[in-house]
């Protein structure tokens, strides 16, 4: 095998979702390694003789034999999230005492905070976590800050909440291939919040910014 990694160029889809995946030109017989930045869904055929590893930002990685799982790992964000749909994965991360490993079971989600070093395992909202694969956004009593984070990744925008009282809101709904304005209009009708695009003269700003007030 060759050790050189072949990068897929930064893929930006029509809904502004992006993914960067790197993989060897040829895999070794006993291991398959890829490097992920962004969010990806993996379906890996079981092969006990060839370990599959997804390397993610903040010195974390996921090892699998045969499974389906979702990974959300952005270099510019503090958290790495892995949701296990089926099979079994082992999540590895750095701690003060060295490398740590945790096994996940189907239906579980692990969240690692690279700043605090804390790790949380919880029951996953699997359908919501993998809904992006089909162009869906699924919310169920989702706090507004989490909902806006989902929209931020999907549509490549930044949100600013200027009314602290709005942080008490949560939303339920399924949106299929809908424009951002339509989704925010749903939020407005159900909660009374308002939104507007913030104009800027900064030509270096990569993302649009939206005020929630």
What label would you give each PLM region?
Residues 1-14, 18-213:
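A residue-level detector for the "anchor" residue at the start of short, highly conserved motifs
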């Amino acid at each position: 095998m060759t050790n050189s990694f072949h990068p897929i160029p930064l893929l930006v889809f029509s809904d502004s979702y992006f993914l960067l995946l790197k993989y060897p030109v040829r895999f070794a017989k006993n291991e398959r390694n890829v490097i992920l930045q962004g969010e990806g869904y993996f379906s890996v055929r079981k092969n006990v003789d060839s370990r599959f590893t997804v390397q993610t930002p903040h010195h974390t990685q996921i090892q699998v034999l045969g499974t389906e799982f979702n990974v959300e790992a952005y270099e510019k964000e503090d958290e790495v999230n892995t949701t296990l749909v089926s099979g079994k994965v082992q999540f590895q991360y750095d701690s003060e005492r060295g490398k740590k490993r945790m096994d996940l079971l189907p239906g579980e989600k692990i969240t690692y905070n690279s700043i605090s070093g804390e790790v949380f395992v919880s029951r996953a909202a699997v359908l919501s976590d993998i809904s992006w694969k089909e162009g869906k956004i699924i919310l169920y009593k989702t706090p507004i800050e989490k909902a806006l984070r989902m929209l931020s990744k999907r549509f490549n925008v930044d949100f600013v909440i200027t009314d602290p009282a709005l942080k008490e809101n949560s939303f339920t709904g399924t949106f299929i291939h809908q424009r951002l304005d339509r989704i925010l209009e749903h939020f407005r009708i159900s909660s009374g919040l308002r939104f507007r695009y913030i104009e800027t003269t900064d030509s270096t700003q990569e993302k649009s910014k939206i005020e929630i007030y």
